[in-house]
């Protein structure tokens, strides 16, 4: 990938800013997401809650199923590959997917190395729970970062923790002297140019979304107020009592995240939220994958 192409990919990801990206399992769900105002959909055979419940090895979704979703909607379609599985990424690029998510939700294919994202033309999304992880993924060619949260739980606590951690570390970098940035880059194991960008601009060089545990409009607005530039919603919509209404409400919450009156209004009568799992009741499986 050329430098110009990478800049284009980062700009493509910027176009999703202020939007909601929803996990969908079939064309019908994709159409519901599009009608609700989703900025993009994530095509996958099993949503995180089902992956967690079933256990075993989880892999890239069937390309035929992804293509059916691509044909059903006009908004961008994303799909997940396993961490380090560059052949799954090659397959998704071959079917002209709009974005690839190198995701800790699936079972890692490589426990040491991530995909070299600069070998691809398509933009990549990656998860991160702190500034070091985020900048390492960006150094590999990621065009978009999201918090990891703990997918499939409906518990927002980890996404909040990751976003706050990233914000704190960004502020720490901003407070360093210019000549201290080289040591910071060494500690974070990233090129100094990325640390210099954070120092100067007070944010990541790419768009930063929230993901993991978003189940209500209030959750989505919370992440936006903490500094997220958009929200991924996985199990929270289609594991709820009224997916159509909840999808629309979460989109409105992201748009109006600083307006409590609107948030109160759209939070009414949504039906039952997905059954959540407290982080103290489970083993943290996914958020720790891929550092």
UniProtKB/Swiss-Prot annotation:
Location of the active site: 80 (schiff-base intermediate with d-ribose 5-phosphate)
Amino acids binding D-ribose 5-phosphate: 23, 152, 213, 234-235
SUPFAM superfamilies, per database record: Ribulose-phoshate binding barrel
Organism domain of life: Bacteria
Residues the entry annotates as binding D-glyceraldehyde 3-phosphate: 164
Keywords: Lyase, Pyridoxal phosphate, Schiff base
EC nos: 4.3.3.6
Gene Ontology molecular-function annotations: amine-lyase activity; pyridoxal 5'-phosphate synthase (glutamine hydrolysing) activity
Reaction(s) this enzyme catalyzes, per UniProt: aldehydo-D-ribose 5-phosphate + D-glyceraldehyde 3-phosphate + L-glutamine = pyridoxal 5'-phosphate + L-glutamate + phosphate + 3 H2O + H(+)
InterPro entries: Aldolase_TIM, PdxS/SNZ, PdxS/SNZ_N, RibuloseP-bd_barrel
Sequence similarity: Belongs to the PdxS/SNZ family.
HAMAP family: PdxS (MF_01824)
The protein's name: Pyridoxal 5'-phosphate synthase subunit PdxS
Organism: Streptococcus pneumoniae (strain ATCC BAA-255 / R6)
Gene: pdxS
């Amino acid at each position: 990938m050329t430098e110009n192409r990478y800049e284009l990919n980062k700009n493509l990801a910027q176009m999703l800013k202020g939007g909601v990206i929803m996990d969908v399992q079939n064309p019908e769900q994709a159409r519901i997401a599009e009608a609700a105002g989703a900025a993009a959909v994530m095509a996958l055979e099993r949503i995180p809650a089902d992956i967690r419940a079933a256990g075993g090895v989880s892999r890239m979704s069937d390309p035929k199923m992804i293509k059916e979703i691509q044909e059903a909607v006009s908004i961008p379609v994303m799909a997940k590959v396993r961490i380090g599985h560059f052949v799954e990424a090659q397959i998704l690029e071959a079917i002209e997917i709009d974005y690839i998510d190198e995701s800790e939700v699936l079972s890692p294919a490589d426990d040491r190395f991530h995909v070299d994202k600069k070998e691809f033309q398509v933009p990549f999304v990656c998860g991160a729970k702190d500034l070091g992880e985020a900048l390492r993924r960006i150094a590999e060619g990621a065009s978009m970062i999201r918090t990891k949260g703990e997918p499939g739980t409906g518990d927002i606590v980890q996404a909040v923790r990751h976003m706050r951690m990233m914000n704190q570390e960004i502020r720490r970098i901003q407070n360093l002297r210019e000549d201290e940035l080289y040591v910071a880059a060494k500690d974070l194991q990233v090129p100094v140019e990325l640390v210099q960008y954070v120092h100067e601009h007070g944010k990541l060089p790419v768009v930063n979304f929230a993901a993991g545990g978003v189940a209500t409009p209030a959750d989505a607005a919370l992440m936006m107020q903490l500094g997220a530039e958009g929200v991924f919603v996985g199990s929270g919509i289609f594991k709820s009592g009224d997916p159509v209404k909840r999808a629309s409400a979460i989109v409105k919450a992201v748009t109006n995240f600083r307006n409590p009156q609107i948030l109160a209004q759209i939070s009414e009568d949504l039906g039952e939220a997905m059954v959540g799992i407290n982080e103290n009741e489970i083993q943290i499986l996914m958020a720790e994958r891929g550092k």
